[in-house]
Every structure is written in C-alpha cells, then in structure tokens.
Amino acid sequence: MSTAPKSQPVSADPVHVDSKHYTIDAENDRVRVIRARYGPREKSVMHGHPSLVAVFLSSNNGRFTFPDGRTEERSWKAGESMIMPAEEHLPENLSDNPLEVVLIELK
C-alpha cells in the first residue's frame, strides 16, 4: 500500500524522493503526519504536498523554490503553526541551526 496522499503522485511525495529529510510519524485514511528534519544549510529536492498544517519545532529562515523558478524566503519561530495550501517546492534551510517541523497533510 502506498503511503503517498491520494492528491499527489508518488514521484513528488517527499517521503519517497527525500527520505533523508522526511519520515512518516502517523497516517490514516484522513491525514498523514510527516516529520521534516534538515541540518544547517541543507536543501531538499522538488516535491509536493497537499494542503497541510505545519507546526514548527525550531526557529529558522528558509527559501522555497517553485517549479516556475520563482523563489520565496520565509521565516518562522518555534511553536508557530500555519495552514499552507497544496504546493510543489524545493525547500532550503538558510539557518545555521537544524530545522524541524511537523507537517499534518490533509487527504
């Protein structure tokens, strides 16, 4: 059985294309909880997420590169949460500290 949410192809699933940074904490037929961990200055590969809630466990700055080449820098503090729309991106930790975030993907 695939662990990818039904709303995206397995090839874009971060757990499949970047298992170094993404692991599944829990999953059922309605949600999937992923933990993302990046070392200082590490980046991922292009992948996608369905709509989700992000809960940040560390304070960091990051850069997101989108399929069209556009980039966006974002900052967050430990303990913050935010609702994020479905998107494809390549994230990068711009901080000198590790980044950890829990992603609650909606199916």
Model regions: which residues?
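Structural motif
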Residues: 60-63, 88, 98
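Glycine- and acidic-residue-biased ligand/ion/polar-headgroup-sensing regions
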Residues: 49-68
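Short, flexible beta-strand-to-coil junctions
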Residues: 57, 106-107
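Short, surface-exposed coil-to-beta transition loops
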Residues: 50, 86-87
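A short, N-terminal "cap"/entry segment at the start of jelly-roll beta-barrel domains
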Residues: 1-46, 66, 72-85, 92, ...
